[in-house]
Amino acid sequence: MVQDRLAVPRGRDRYGCAKTSIALAVSATLAGCATLDTSHDAASINTLLAAHGGPSTGWDRNSKDDASAVSSWLAHPLTSDVAVRVAMLRSPRLQQLYGELGLAHADVLQAVQVANPRLGISSLALQNGPGSQLVLGLAAPLVDLIALPSRTRLARLEQDRSRLRIASAVLTVSLDVESAWYRSIGAEQVAGMRAAVADALQTSADLAQRFFDAGNITELQLNRELAAASLARIAASRALIDARLARLDLNTLMGLRGSEAGWTSSAVLPLPVEHEDDPIVLRQTASASSLDLLAARKEATIFASSARTTRALRLLGGTTIGYDREREVDGSVIKGPTLDLDLPIFNQGGARVARADAQLRIAKAKLALIELSADNAIDLAVERVRVLSDIVRIHREELVPQREIVALRSQDEENYALIGEFEVLMAKAQEYDAYQGFLEAVRDYWLARVDLTRLVGSRLPSDREVTRNTPSVGDILHTGTAPPAAATHAGHATGADPTSTPTGAPEHHHNEGGQR
């Protein structure tokens, strides 16, 4: 702060005082108006999510209505849509994101705040003399005031980027829950099939023991059957643990514990879609609407604008403007504007400019890397989905029907005493293995589609084609249901068509509010 102790003519004094007062008043007004409305961030994020096929968020944490809704949802078999909706209300990761949204609000508001003006007061008295000198001074940072419009513009851009980033994180959580649901249902199906194989091989082992006790088979043949049954029990136990762990992971993502974690499921997965998406269309969709890509572009825009502002104001440094009023010992008053200027002799802001330019280069390189990686990753993910779809088809149309024929003809040959019961039981176990491979292939296919959805940043167009489900483990074990083409290959009917949605099974939809 500078105190001007030189008297000036009254006319110029009034003129200077008026200009300074107006400048400080305008500065205060600008600083007061430089606020951003963050009250609609939650609604804006939900709008972004809806545009990308994501779920709406429950921004009110654990209200009574939310608890009632969750209880109602969990009273029915859990679908992936319901799992995502529960997570939007209960997931600890979502609560963390809500907190990060509050931090983003604080950062944005902080960015547009001008440093408070400084008020200086001093009272100086003459030693052993009458009277005192009173000095009042008010100063404000000039750079903050000049840069305020630019900072406000940058803050709005940063606010938009924060919304995109939070929306992307929410979408990621929803896809994590969806993946966990597929893993849980798939693990439950595998556990059921491994248990069936273990039962079949245990039956074979028990039969072998009776034959050995009767002296009909050797000790070598007996232990072959016993060892196969032991391995099957081990595999069944591991599959059961895997299913429980997958269920635990899903409950953790949904934010469920205790009695709420005991939900039931229909334990069926959708069949692959008939026609997969065009990778060119998916790349175009990702380029236009991927939340991560949009956030990276917004970040590059922010650093470009920040670099321009830094370069324009590099010489001002810590310059302040103000107004002083001084009352002398004799009662006279002098007053006027002040300017506290940093002379850019040694430091001309080169470091700030270099830092801003480096940040801009990093942001541009990051954006280019995201764009390149997205294109390449989408191509690879599309190919992976296609290959897994082919694997599902091979299981449905070839392997499972072939194993069914082997099991059926083995039974026929056993009836004519051409082969023994051990061969029949082994053929049945191999048939169950084929079914397990089919169910695992379907699970892997949907996990690959979720990964592709992550890369695209929105729901895949072909999601609307999902209409049919796989057979459940119960259908396979009790009704003889097989994938299509089994009847035509085997030359006999094996049960209900598994490509139709079983009674009571959830249909597979990706629109908000639907079930899958």
Model regions and ranges:
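Short segments within alpha-helical structural elements
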Residues: 231-258, 366, 400-461, 484-490
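Amphipathic alpha-helical coiled-coil segments and their boundaries
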Residues: 80-83, 90, 97, 141, ...
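Coiled-coil heptad-register positions
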Residues: 105, 112, 119, 170, ...
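Terminal intrinsically disordered/low-complexity segments used for targeting and assembly
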Residues: 2-11, 15-89, 240-285, 451-516
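A small-residue-enriched
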Residues: 34-57, 85-144, 247-256, 283-351, ...
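Amphipathic alpha-helical segments within well-ordered protein domains
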Residues: 84, 139, 206-210, 283, ...
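Periplasmic alpha-helical coiled-coil/stalk elements that build and connect Gram-negative outer-membrane
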Residues: 34, 148-150, 157, 164-285, ...
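Charged, solvent-exposed faces of alpha-helical coiled-coils
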Residues: 93, 100, 107, 151, ...
